[in-house]
Protein backbone atom coordinates (compact mmCIF):
# COMPACT_ATOMS: atom_id res chain seq x y z
CA UNK A 1 0.00 0.00 0.00
CA UNK A 2 1.33 3.43 -0.99
CA UNK A 3 0.63 6.41 1.24
CA UNK A 4 2.18 9.58 -0.15
CA UNK A 5 5.90 9.13 -0.88
CA UNK A 6 6.25 5.97 1.22
CA UNK A 7 5.06 2.39 1.29
CA UNK A 8 2.81 2.00 4.32
CA UNK A 9 2.01 -1.71 4.17
CA UNK A 10 2.78 -4.88 2.22
CA UNK A 11 0.88 -8.14 2.45
CA UNK A 12 -2.22 -10.15 1.71
CA UNK A 13 -5.75 -9.57 2.93
CA UNK A 14 -8.60 -7.17 2.33
CA UNK A 15 -7.77 -3.50 1.77
CA UNK A 16 -8.57 -0.85 4.32
CA UNK A 17 -11.77 1.10 3.83
CA UNK A 18 -11.43 3.94 1.35
CA UNK A 19 -8.32 2.58 -0.33
CA UNK A 20 -8.06 2.62 -4.14
CA UNK A 21 -7.06 -0.89 -5.16
CA UNK A 22 -5.83 -1.87 -8.61
CA UNK A 23 -6.06 -5.31 -10.16
CA UNK A 24 -2.87 -5.63 -12.19
CA UNK A 25 -3.58 -9.18 -13.29
CA UNK A 26 -0.45 -11.25 -13.90
CA UNK A 27 1.86 -8.26 -13.93
CA UNK A 28 4.84 -8.08 -11.60
CA UNK A 29 5.29 -5.33 -9.01
CA UNK A 30 8.93 -4.76 -8.00
CA UNK A 31 11.08 -2.09 -6.37
CA UNK A 32 12.27 0.65 -8.70
CA UNK A 33 15.59 -0.03 -10.38
CA UNK A 34 18.81 1.60 -9.14
CA UNK A 35 21.73 2.23 -11.52
CA UNK A 36 25.17 2.74 -9.98
CA UNK A 37 26.98 3.33 -13.27
CA UNK A 38 25.37 5.63 -15.83
CA UNK A 39 27.08 8.35 -17.87
CA UNK A 40 24.09 9.70 -19.79
CA UNK A 41 20.95 9.05 -21.75
CA UNK A 42 18.34 10.81 -23.82
CA UNK A 43 20.97 12.99 -25.50
CA UNK A 44 22.77 14.34 -22.41
CA UNK A 45 25.90 13.29 -20.53
CA UNK A 46 27.19 13.86 -17.01
CA UNK A 47 30.56 15.59 -17.59
CA UNK A 48 30.22 19.32 -18.17
CA UNK A 49 31.87 22.71 -17.93
CA UNK A 50 29.41 24.53 -15.66
CA UNK A 51 27.73 23.47 -12.44
CA UNK A 52 24.25 24.35 -13.67
CA UNK A 53 24.78 22.60 -17.00
CA UNK A 54 25.80 19.42 -15.20
CA UNK A 55 22.88 19.61 -12.77
CA UNK A 56 20.37 20.07 -15.58
CA UNK A 57 21.92 17.26 -17.63
CA UNK A 58 21.90 14.86 -14.69
CA UNK A 59 18.24 15.58 -13.93
CA UNK A 60 17.31 15.18 -17.61
CA UNK A 61 19.26 11.92 -17.74
CA UNK A 62 17.44 10.64 -14.65
CA UNK A 63 14.06 11.48 -16.14
CA UNK A 64 14.94 9.64 -19.35
CA UNK A 65 16.00 6.54 -17.45
CA UNK A 66 12.78 6.66 -15.39
CA UNK A 67 10.98 5.76 -18.61
CA UNK A 68 12.89 2.48 -18.38
CA UNK A 69 12.25 1.79 -14.70
CA UNK A 70 15.17 3.56 -13.03
CA UNK A 71 13.97 5.37 -9.93
CA UNK A 72 17.39 6.26 -8.48
CA UNK A 73 20.89 6.47 -9.90
CA UNK A 74 24.48 7.43 -9.21
CA UNK A 75 25.60 9.88 -11.90
CA UNK A 76 28.90 8.65 -13.33
CA UNK A 77 31.66 10.90 -14.66
CA UNK A 78 34.43 9.73 -16.97
CA UNK A 79 38.05 10.81 -16.52
CA UNK A 80 38.55 14.48 -17.32
CA UNK A 81 40.69 17.49 -16.46
CA UNK A 82 40.85 18.21 -12.75
CA UNK A 83 38.82 21.43 -12.95
CA UNK A 84 36.15 19.75 -15.09
CA UNK A 85 35.80 16.89 -12.63
CA UNK A 86 35.43 19.32 -9.73
CA UNK A 87 32.77 21.24 -11.65
CA UNK A 88 31.02 18.00 -12.57
CA UNK A 89 30.98 16.77 -8.99
CA UNK A 90 29.51 20.10 -7.85
CA UNK A 91 26.83 19.83 -10.53
CA UNK A 92 25.93 16.31 -9.46
CA UNK A 93 25.67 17.52 -5.86
CA UNK A 94 23.29 20.25 -7.01
CA UNK A 95 21.18 17.70 -8.88
CA UNK A 96 21.15 15.44 -5.82
CA UNK A 97 19.73 18.31 -3.77
CA UNK A 98 16.74 18.83 -6.08
CA UNK A 99 13.47 18.25 -4.25
CA UNK A 100 10.97 17.42 -7.00
CA UNK A 101 9.19 14.42 -5.43
CA UNK A 102 8.29 12.99 -8.82
CA UNK A 103 11.83 13.03 -10.18
CA UNK A 104 14.16 10.02 -9.86
CA UNK A 105 16.62 10.37 -7.01
CA UNK A 106 20.20 11.33 -7.82
CA UNK A 107 22.08 9.49 -5.09
CA UNK A 108 25.41 11.17 -5.76
CA UNK A 109 28.49 10.82 -7.94
CA UNK A 110 30.53 7.91 -9.21
CA UNK A 111 33.96 8.94 -10.49
CA UNK A 112 35.15 6.39 -13.03
CA UNK A 113 38.68 7.72 -13.01
CA UNK A 114 40.99 9.54 -13.36
CA UNK A 115 43.30 7.13 -11.46
CA UNK A 116 43.09 4.28 -13.96
CA UNK A 117 45.57 2.10 -15.87
CA UNK A 118 46.39 3.61 -19.29
CA UNK A 119 46.69 0.11 -20.74
CA UNK A 120 43.08 -0.56 -19.69
CA UNK A 121 41.66 2.84 -20.56
CA UNK A 122 38.86 1.43 -22.68
CA UNK A 123 36.77 4.45 -23.66
CA UNK A 124 38.40 6.71 -21.08
CA UNK A 125 40.45 9.54 -22.58
CA UNK A 126 44.11 8.52 -21.97
CA UNK A 127 45.05 12.20 -21.83
CA UNK A 128 43.16 12.53 -18.55
CA UNK A 129 44.50 9.46 -16.76
CA UNK A 130 46.97 10.40 -14.02
CA UNK A 131 48.67 9.29 -10.82
CA UNK A 132 46.52 9.13 -7.68
CA UNK A 133 46.69 12.35 -5.67
CA UNK A 134 45.57 12.92 -2.09
CA UNK A 135 45.26 16.64 -2.86
CA UNK A 136 42.94 15.95 -5.78
CA UNK A 137 40.89 13.56 -3.66
CA UNK A 138 40.53 16.27 -1.02
CA UNK A 139 39.34 18.78 -3.62
CA UNK A 140 36.81 16.30 -5.02
CA UNK A 141 35.47 15.46 -1.57
CA UNK A 142 35.09 19.15 -0.79
CA UNK A 143 33.28 19.77 -4.09
CA UNK A 144 30.94 16.82 -3.56
CA UNK A 145 29.85 18.01 -0.11
CA UNK A 146 28.99 14.49 1.03
CA UNK A 147 27.60 13.20 -2.28
CA UNK A 148 30.62 11.30 -3.60
CA UNK A 149 29.41 7.69 -3.52
CA UNK A 150 31.93 5.68 -5.55
CA UNK A 151 35.38 6.04 -7.09
CA UNK A 152 36.86 3.55 -9.53
CA UNK A 153 40.62 3.13 -9.23
CA UNK A 154 43.39 0.88 -10.56
CA UNK A 155 45.01 -0.35 -7.33
CA UNK A 156 48.39 -1.05 -8.92
CA UNK A 157 49.02 2.65 -9.55
CA UNK A 158 51.48 4.36 -7.16
CA UNK A 159 49.62 5.87 -4.23
CA UNK A 160 46.37 4.04 -4.95
CA UNK A 161 46.20 2.22 -1.63
CA UNK A 162 46.54 5.49 0.29
CA UNK A 163 43.70 6.94 -1.80
CA UNK A 164 41.54 3.90 -1.03
CA UNK A 165 42.14 4.25 2.71
CA UNK A 166 41.49 8.01 2.76
CA UNK A 167 38.37 7.80 0.61
CA UNK A 168 36.88 4.91 2.58
CA UNK A 169 37.45 6.89 5.78
CA UNK A 170 35.43 9.69 4.17
CA UNK A 171 32.53 7.34 3.41
CA UNK A 172 33.24 6.66 -0.27
CA UNK A 173 32.85 3.17 -1.73
CA UNK A 174 36.11 2.37 -3.52
CA UNK A 175 35.90 0.19 -6.59
CA UNK A 176 38.60 -1.70 -8.50
CA UNK A 177 38.42 -1.18 -12.25
CA UNK A 178 40.20 -0.25 -15.48
CA UNK A 179 43.12 -2.15 -14.06
CA UNK A 180 46.02 -4.49 -14.78
CA UNK A 181 45.97 -5.74 -11.19
CA UNK A 182 46.68 -9.40 -10.60
CA UNK A 183 44.95 -11.57 -8.00
CA UNK A 184 47.21 -10.58 -5.10
CA UNK A 185 47.17 -6.85 -5.89
CA UNK A 186 43.38 -6.94 -6.06
CA UNK A 187 43.22 -8.66 -2.69
CA UNK A 188 45.56 -6.02 -1.28
CA UNK A 189 43.12 -3.36 -2.48
CA UNK A 190 40.30 -5.19 -0.72
CA UNK A 191 42.39 -5.33 2.46
CA UNK A 192 42.85 -1.54 2.19
CA UNK A 193 39.08 -1.08 2.09
CA UNK A 194 37.90 -1.40 -1.53
CA UNK A 195 34.56 -3.20 -1.56
CA UNK A 196 33.34 -3.04 -5.17
CA UNK A 197 34.46 -3.89 -8.70
CA UNK A 198 33.52 -1.77 -11.71
CA UNK A 199 32.05 -3.66 -14.69
CA UNK A 200 33.51 -7.06 -13.85
CA UNK A 201 35.34 -8.72 -16.79
CA UNK A 202 35.59 -5.48 -18.77
CA UNK A 203 38.79 -3.35 -18.79
CA UNK A 204 40.72 -5.85 -16.65
CA UNK A 205 42.61 -9.13 -17.05
CA UNK A 206 40.28 -12.03 -17.76
CA UNK A 207 39.71 -15.10 -15.62
CA UNK A 208 42.45 -17.68 -16.21
CA UNK A 209 43.00 -20.88 -14.26
CA UNK A 210 46.66 -20.05 -13.58
CA UNK A 211 46.31 -16.26 -13.45
CA UNK A 212 42.98 -15.70 -11.69
CA UNK A 213 43.24 -11.91 -11.63
CA UNK A 214 40.66 -9.48 -10.27
CA UNK A 215 37.65 -11.51 -11.45
CA UNK A 216 38.45 -14.48 -9.23
CA UNK A 217 39.56 -12.24 -6.36
CA UNK A 218 36.21 -10.45 -6.39
CA UNK A 219 33.97 -13.48 -6.83
CA UNK A 220 35.80 -15.37 -4.07
CA UNK A 221 35.49 -12.57 -1.50
CA UNK A 222 32.03 -12.36 0.05
CA UNK A 223 32.62 -8.73 1.09
CA UNK A 224 32.83 -7.56 -2.51
CA UNK A 225 30.01 -6.43 -4.79
CA UNK A 226 30.52 -6.59 -8.55
CA UNK A 227 28.99 -4.68 -11.45
CA UNK A 228 27.82 -6.51 -14.55
CA UNK A 229 26.92 -4.66 -17.76
CA UNK A 230 23.96 -6.87 -18.61
CA UNK A 231 23.52 -6.07 -22.29
CA UNK A 232 24.71 -9.37 -23.76
CA UNK A 233 27.45 -7.44 -25.60
CA UNK A 234 29.98 -6.56 -22.92
CA UNK A 235 29.61 -10.03 -21.37
CA UNK A 236 28.36 -13.20 -23.05
CA UNK A 237 25.02 -14.33 -21.58
CA UNK A 238 26.57 -17.59 -20.37
CA UNK A 239 29.21 -15.64 -18.43
CA UNK A 240 26.53 -13.33 -17.04
CA UNK A 241 24.72 -16.38 -15.70
CA UNK A 242 27.95 -17.81 -14.30
CA UNK A 243 28.82 -14.60 -12.45
CA UNK A 244 25.29 -14.26 -11.09
CA UNK A 245 25.39 -17.85 -9.85
CA UNK A 246 28.74 -17.22 -8.17
CA UNK A 247 27.58 -14.04 -6.42
CA UNK A 248 23.76 -13.88 -6.42
CA UNK A 249 23.63 -11.54 -3.42
CA UNK A 250 26.60 -9.40 -4.52
CA UNK A 251 26.06 -8.82 -8.23
CA UNK A 252 24.84 -5.40 -9.39
CA UNK A 253 23.27 -4.90 -12.81
CA UNK A 254 24.43 -1.61 -14.35
CA UNK A 255 23.90 0.06 -17.70
CA UNK A 256 27.13 2.03 -18.28
CA UNK A 257 24.79 4.01 -20.56
CA UNK A 258 25.99 7.05 -22.48
CA UNK A 259 24.15 10.02 -23.97
CA UNK A 260 23.07 7.94 -27.00
CA UNK A 261 20.76 5.74 -24.91
CA UNK A 262 17.27 6.13 -26.34
CA UNK A 263 18.50 7.69 -29.59
CA UNK A 264 19.04 6.46 -33.14
CA UNK A 265 22.28 5.22 -34.69
CA UNK A 266 24.89 7.91 -35.22
CA UNK A 267 27.86 9.70 -33.69
CA UNK A 268 27.82 10.94 -30.08
CA UNK A 269 30.22 12.03 -27.32
CA UNK A 270 31.50 10.29 -24.22
CA UNK A 271 33.35 12.96 -22.32
CA UNK A 272 35.58 14.44 -25.02
CA UNK A 273 35.70 11.31 -27.17
CA UNK A 274 33.72 10.65 -30.35
CA UNK A 275 31.75 7.42 -30.25
CA UNK A 276 29.58 5.60 -32.76
CA UNK A 277 26.27 3.84 -32.13
CA UNK A 278 25.38 1.08 -34.59
CA UNK A 279 22.55 -1.20 -33.57
CA UNK A 280 22.97 -1.78 -29.85
CA UNK A 281 26.77 -1.51 -29.92
CA UNK A 282 28.65 1.68 -28.99
CA UNK A 283 32.33 1.94 -29.88
CA UNK A 284 35.02 4.56 -30.21
CA UNK A 285 34.68 6.27 -33.57
CA UNK A 286 38.37 5.68 -34.34
CA UNK A 287 39.38 2.40 -35.92
CA UNK A 288 40.02 0.36 -32.74
CA UNK A 289 36.37 -0.56 -32.30
CA UNK A 290 36.77 -0.45 -28.51
CA UNK A 291 33.44 -0.65 -26.69
CA UNK A 292 32.47 2.78 -25.35
CA UNK A 293 29.71 2.37 -22.82
CA UNK A 294 26.28 1.21 -23.90
CA UNK A 295 22.73 2.23 -24.72
CA UNK A 296 21.41 -0.23 -22.16
CA UNK A 297 18.53 0.60 -19.84
CA UNK A 298 17.74 -1.11 -16.55
CA UNK A 299 14.52 -2.77 -17.74
CA UNK A 300 16.44 -4.39 -20.57
CA UNK A 301 19.26 -5.36 -18.18
CA UNK A 302 16.83 -7.31 -16.00
CA UNK A 303 15.25 -8.99 -19.02
CA UNK A 304 18.70 -9.90 -20.38
CA UNK A 305 19.68 -11.54 -17.10
CA UNK A 306 16.47 -13.59 -17.02
CA UNK A 307 16.91 -14.59 -20.67
CA UNK A 308 20.41 -15.80 -19.74
CA UNK A 309 18.89 -18.17 -17.19
CA UNK A 310 19.19 -16.07 -14.04
CA UNK A 311 16.22 -16.61 -11.69
CA UNK A 312 13.84 -13.66 -11.78
CA UNK A 313 14.18 -12.90 -8.06
CA UNK A 314 17.98 -12.85 -8.36
CA UNK A 315 17.87 -10.57 -11.40
CA UNK A 316 15.50 -8.16 -9.63
CA UNK A 317 17.75 -8.11 -6.55
CA UNK A 318 20.74 -7.20 -8.73
CA UNK A 319 18.81 -4.16 -9.98
CA UNK A 320 17.30 -3.09 -6.65
CA UNK A 321 18.34 -4.23 -3.18
CA UNK A 322 22.03 -4.83 -3.87
CA UNK A 323 22.75 -1.49 -5.57
CA UNK A 324 20.73 0.27 -2.87
CA UNK A 325 23.00 -1.29 -0.26
CA UNK A 326 26.16 -0.26 -2.14
CA UNK A 327 24.92 3.34 -2.43
CA UNK A 328 23.83 3.49 1.21
CA UNK A 329 20.23 4.16 0.14
CA UNK A 330 18.52 2.28 2.95
CA UNK A 331 15.02 3.51 2.08
CA UNK A 332 15.23 2.22 -1.50
CA UNK A 333 15.44 -1.08 -3.32
CA UNK A 334 12.72 -2.88 -1.37
CA UNK A 335 8.96 -3.16 -1.02
CA UNK A 336 8.50 -2.80 2.72
CA UNK A 337 6.67 -0.53 5.16
CA UNK A 338 8.55 2.75 5.49
CA UNK A 339 10.50 2.34 2.25
CA UNK A 340 10.28 4.94 -0.49
CA UNK A 341 7.36 4.32 -2.84
CA UNK A 342 9.65 3.70 -5.81
CA UNK A 343 7.97 0.97 -7.81
CA UNK A 344 8.02 -0.58 -11.26
CA UNK A 345 5.22 -2.59 -12.81
CA UNK A 346 6.35 -5.16 -15.37
CA UNK A 347 4.38 -7.12 -17.91
CA UNK A 348 4.66 -10.94 -17.70
CA UNK A 349 7.32 -10.78 -20.44
CA UNK A 350 9.21 -8.19 -18.31
CA UNK A 351 8.47 -5.21 -20.53
CA UNK A 352 8.08 -2.09 -18.40
CA UNK A 353 4.46 -1.04 -17.93
CA UNK A 354 4.81 1.82 -15.43
CA UNK A 355 7.27 3.61 -13.15
CA UNK A 356 6.34 5.20 -9.82
CA UNK A 357 8.79 7.49 -8.01
CA UNK A 358 8.03 8.65 -4.49
CA UNK A 359 4.40 7.61 -4.89
CA UNK A 360 3.95 9.56 -8.13
CA UNK A 361 3.42 7.97 -11.52
CA UNK A 362 6.21 9.25 -13.78
CA UNK A 363 5.84 6.82 -16.67
CA UNK A 364 2.68 5.03 -17.75
CA UNK A 365 2.53 5.16 -21.56
CA UNK A 366 -0.34 2.68 -21.80
CA UNK A 367 -2.30 4.43 -19.04
CA UNK A 368 -2.29 1.16 -17.14
CA UNK A 369 -2.84 2.81 -13.78
CA UNK A 370 -5.86 4.64 -15.14
CA UNK A 371 -7.36 1.62 -16.86
CA UNK A 372 -6.51 -1.23 -14.47
CA UNK A 373 -9.62 -2.71 -12.95
CA UNK A 374 -10.55 -1.04 -9.70
CA UNK A 375 -11.52 -3.21 -6.77
CA UNK A 376 -13.72 -1.39 -4.29
CA UNK A 377 -12.26 -1.45 -0.82
CA UNK A 378 -13.94 -4.08 1.30
CA UNK A 379 -15.41 -5.98 -1.66
CA UNK A 380 -12.36 -7.99 -2.72
CA UNK A 381 -12.58 -11.67 -1.99
Residues covered by each model-derived region:
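Conserved, mostly hydrophobic/aromatic
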Residues: 37, 65, 111, 167, ...
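Metal-associated gating/positioning segment near the N- to mid-region
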Residues: 27-84
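His/Asp/Glu-enriched, well-ordered alpha-helical/loop segment
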Residues: 213-226, 232, 244-339, 343-346
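C-terminal cap of metal-dependent C-N hydrolases
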Residues: 334-381
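Histidine-rich, glycine-flanked metal-binding segment
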Residues: 1-31
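Non-cysteine beta-strand/loop elements that form the S-adenosyl-L-methionine
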Residues: 31-35, 106-115, 151-152, 194-201, ...
Amino acid sequence: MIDGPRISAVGAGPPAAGQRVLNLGRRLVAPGFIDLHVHGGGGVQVNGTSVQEVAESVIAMARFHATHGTTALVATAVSDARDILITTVRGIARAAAQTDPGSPAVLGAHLEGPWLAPSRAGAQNPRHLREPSIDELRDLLDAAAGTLRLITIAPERPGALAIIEKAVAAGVVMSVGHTEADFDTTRTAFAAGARHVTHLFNAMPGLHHRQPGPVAAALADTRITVELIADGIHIHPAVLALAMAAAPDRAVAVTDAISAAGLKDGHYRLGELDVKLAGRRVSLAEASGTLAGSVLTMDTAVATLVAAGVPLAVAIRAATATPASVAGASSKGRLAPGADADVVILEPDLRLAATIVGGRVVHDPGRLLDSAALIEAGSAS
